[in-house]
Amino acid sequence: MSNIIKAIEDAQLKQDLPKFSPGDTVIVQVKVKEGERERLQAFEGVVIAIRNRGLHSAFTVRKISNGEGVERTFQTHSPIVNSIEVKRRGAVRRAKLYYLRERSGKSARIKEKLAKK
């Protein structure tokens, strides 16, 4: 029985996702339906958490909008998520960056990860 469920879930996984980790700045293109039309809306921010659960994987992105912190959680393999683009790689030493919620300004900055030679 579990083999059937696994086969169905594997068929629904997205294959074209970039590798990203907490601390990375990403641009998530989200499909938004307004009345009859459907358009793409970009949500750019820092990945503060990733939850790896196969088809049920999710990640949380945080950005500052008009001086107010905004967090949005996306299902990684959802059809609503059109694309994910990694804008910059961040060097962090934690898996969950919830401490960024209490910080603002310069203390909330994340160092950029240097490329390996």
UniProtKB/Swiss-Prot annotation:
The keyword Cell membrane does not apply. One of its GO terms (cellular component) is cytosolic large ribosomal subunit. InterPro entries: Ribosomal_bL19 (IPR001857), Ribosomal_bL19_CS (IPR018257), Ribosomal_bL19_sf (IPR038657), Translation_prot_SH3-like_sf (IPR008991). The keyword Hydrolase does not apply. PROSITE patterns: RIBOSOMAL_L19 (PS01015). GO terms for molecular function: structural constituent of ribosome. Keywords: Ribonucleoprotein, Ribosomal protein. Pfam families: Ribosomal_L19. GO terms for biological process: translation. Belongs to the bacterial ribosomal protein bL19 family. PANTHER family: LARGE RIBOSOMAL SUBUNIT PROTEIN BL19M (PTHR15680:SF9), RIBOSOMAL PROTEIN L19 (PTHR15680). This protein is located at the 30S-50S ribosomal subunit interface and may play a role in the structure and function of the aminoacyl-tRNA binding site. This is Large ribosomal subunit protein bL19. It comes from Aliivibrio salmonicida (strain LFI1238).
